[in-house]
């Protein structure tokens, strides 16, 4: 199997001052191309350290993606490190210099002399275009390893990997068939509870079951060779059956996006009233393009379930909305949810049975519960379902 590695560079990455989102993205992207990373390293802005690790990994990796260090400042050392590791000098890439000058001119700016550095590449380098920025990439062969050098700006990095680097890898290597990955996302059951229920299922050859907990959800992931796709799809039905009502969506689209699409398909507008969730519902649904008619965040106040239900019923009528959803304040470990619909208003009063979680996590959990109520109503299900440490203690319905 092709050994693919990544090297992230920069003091700010090494010292944890920024999160290395490029590494996480590349690992996931390459995995789904059939190119799982075998190693990731991080090195700061030190020329000797960079040269040392380039030479070291050149003896072990078939492909190395180097990220960062292609800017115009003194601490951008990747091109010099690559040239030094190969024992050659830097040469000016005249065509890229002209491209940078054009880039700045079109934006009404004069290119700083320091940007010239971004057109200086190792003498033997293969130029790699950057269609969205001023830091071009390049590739060099060092011992057994083909090394690709890329800018650290995420938007530039992703474009270059997808449109410049991956096609080159497909040309030069015989790549394996990408694996099949089937995902189910659950809400309301613990990881250990799900594992205990699912461990009895028989997995096809080469197929693994993975669990990824990201409060308040748990993703169940079946990964295996394409030759087992039919068996995996059959197994996925068994996983859904065992996981039961805790399954809230399939794939990677996300619950807000799926709700948004369903609202649009059924021509429902939505109005929101939030207290404890502090605008999380509005944020998630607006990012997904949901047809929101009106949103409000109001200070927490103690209210009965009936008060919450009547309030959201009136709000739906006043805004001529198709649907209206409310989350009350959090008082004495209790809060209310209410959903006003053309069929009536449905409301739940719940108790949060654990307080060990931070305020932010409890808000995330309650926002997800509200979204799940909406999802279940749209699917024609009872709005109440099992939610682990959240206990439904009262429910009510207001007729139209």
Please place each PLM-identified region on the residue numbering.
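N-terminal beta-loop-helix "entrance" segment that forms/cooperates
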Residues: 27, 31-59, 305-307
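Short alpha-helical segments enriched in small residues
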Residues: 230-400
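Proline/glycine-rich low-complexity loops and linkers
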Residues: 42, 48-55, 59, 76-172, ...
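Conserved hydrophobic helix-helix packing surfaces used for dimerization/oligomerization
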Residues: 4-6, 147, 270
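Short beta-strand elements
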Residues: 138-140, 211-213, 335-343
């Amino acid at each position: 199997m092709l050994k693919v590695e990544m090297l992230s560079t920069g003091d700010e990455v090494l010292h944890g001052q920024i999160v290395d989102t490029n590494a996480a993205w590349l690992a996931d992207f390459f995995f789904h191309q059939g190119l799982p990373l075998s190693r990731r390293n991080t090195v700061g802005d030190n020329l000797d350290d960079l040269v040392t690790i380039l030479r070291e990994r050149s003896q072990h990796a078939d492909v190395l993606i180097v990220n960062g260090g292609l800017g115009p400042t003194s601490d951008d050392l990747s091109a010099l490190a690559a040239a030094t590791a190969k024992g050659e000098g830097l040469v000016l890439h005249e065509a890229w210099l002209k491209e940078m000058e054009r880039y700045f001119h079109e934006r009404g700016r004069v290119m700083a002399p320091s940007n010239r550095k971004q057109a200086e590449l190792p003498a033997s380098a293969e130029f790699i275009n950057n269609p969205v920025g001023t830091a071009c990439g390049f590739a060099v062969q060092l011992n057994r390893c083909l090394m690709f050098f890329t800018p650290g700006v995420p938007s530039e990095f992703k474009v270059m990997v997808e449109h410049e680097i991956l096609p080159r890898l497909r040309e030069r290597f015989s790549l394996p068939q990408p694996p099949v990955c089937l995902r189910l996302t659950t809400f309301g059951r613990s990881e250990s509870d799900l594992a205990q229920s699912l461990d009895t299922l028989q997995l096809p050859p080469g197929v693994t079951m993975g669990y990824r907990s990201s409060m308040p959800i748990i993703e169940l992931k079946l990964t295996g060779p394409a030759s087992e796709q039919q068996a995996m799809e059959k197994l996925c039905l068994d996983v859904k059956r065992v996981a039961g009502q805790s399954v809230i969506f399939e794939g990677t689209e996300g619950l807000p996006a799926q709700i948004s699409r369903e609202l649009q398909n059924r021509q429902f507008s939505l109005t929101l009233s939030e207290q404890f969730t502090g605008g999380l519902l509005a944020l998630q649904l607006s990012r997904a393009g949901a047809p929101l008619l009106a949103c409000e965040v109001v200070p927490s106040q103690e209210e009965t379930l009936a008060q919450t239900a009547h309030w959201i019923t009136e709000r739906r009528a006043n805004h001529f909305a198709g649907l209206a959803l409310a989350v009350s304040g959090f008082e004495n470990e209790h809060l209310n949810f209410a959903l006003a619909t053309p069929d009536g208003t449905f409301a739940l009063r719940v108790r949060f049975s654990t307080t060990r979680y931070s305020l932010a996590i409890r808000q995330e959990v309650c926002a997800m519960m509200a979204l799940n109520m909406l999802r279940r109503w749209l699917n024609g299900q009872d709005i109440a379902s099992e939610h682990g440490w959240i206990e439904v203690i009262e429910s009510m319905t207001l007729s139209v």
